[in-house]
């Protein structure tokens, strides 16, 4: 959801997450959120279309971060490096507040409709990333493959970071995951010999 400065929008987001955790998403109204945040319902609606938008209001901004990072990546980077560069920028934009992100993830997990919207967002970001790779000259099939695999690895790492213990940041987790992925892709078969075993007789 991004960083948590002290503006009205951020106060509303904090209040909403607290209430969603305490009462459940379905049982929380905009009036409840406004009261917890210490603002009027009209103020909430000035910042968010509805209570669902409180959870997804940063999506366009985060998508723009992803797009702009891919677009501004150094021209000599490989397509895979561009994917990593863009996803690193997204990791920074998500911010360091793991507790707030955990609360948001728990709310999404509790509601099928919210999960569907989140999946739609992920697909949109993946397609956006693929289009930026195509614009840089990558073949479409390659661009779509790299964007999809990069996004899937990011989601898996992000989920592990949210649910895991320890003080490491998301970027540290991404670096570790990519190193492990590289070893898995380029290392020998089953750790020895460098060749795949033949069929059993």
Which role fits each region the language model picked out?
Residues 1-23, 27-39, 56, 65:
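Basic, helix-initiating cap at the start of DNA-binding domains
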Residues 35, 49-50:
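Residue-level detection of the helix-turn-helix DNA-binding "recognition helix"
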Residues 40-48:
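Short hydrophobic/aromatic patch on the recognition helix
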Residues 52-62:
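Alpha-helical DNA-contacting segments of helix-turn-helix folds
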Residues 64-106, 110:
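Hydrophobic alpha-helical connector segments
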Residues 108, 140-160, 173-184:
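Hydrophobic alpha-helical segments that form the core
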Residues 112-136, 144-148:
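Amphipathic alpha-helical packing segments from all-alpha helical-bundle domains
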Residues 166-201:
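C-terminal peripheral helix-coil segments that are non-catalytic and often amphipathic
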């Amino acid at each position: 959801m991004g960083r948590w400065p002290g503006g009205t929008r951020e106060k509303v987001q904090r209040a909403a997450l607290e209430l969603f955790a305490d009462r459940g998403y379905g049982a929380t109204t905009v009036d409840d959120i406004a009261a917890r945040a210490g603002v009027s319902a009209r103020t909430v609606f000035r910042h968010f279309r509805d209570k669902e938008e409180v959870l997804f209001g940063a999506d366009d901004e985060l998508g723009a971060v992803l797009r702009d990072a891919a677009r501004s990546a150094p021209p000599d980077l490989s397509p895979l490096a561009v994917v990593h560069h863009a996803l690193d920028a997204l990791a920074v934009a998500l911010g360091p507040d793991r507790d707030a992100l955990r609360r948001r993830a728990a709310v999404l997990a509790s509601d099928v409709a919210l999960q569907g919207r989140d999946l739609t967002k992920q697909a949109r970001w993946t397609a956006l990333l693929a289009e930026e790779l195509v614009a840089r000259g990558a073949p479409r099939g390659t661009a779509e493959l790299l964007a999809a695999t990069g996004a899937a690895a990011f989601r898996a790492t992000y989920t592990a970071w949210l649910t895991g213990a320890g003080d490491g940041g998301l970027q540290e987790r991404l670096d570790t995951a990519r190193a492990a992925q590289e070893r898995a892709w380029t290392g020998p078969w089953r750790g020895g010999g460098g060749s795949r075993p033949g069929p059993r007789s």
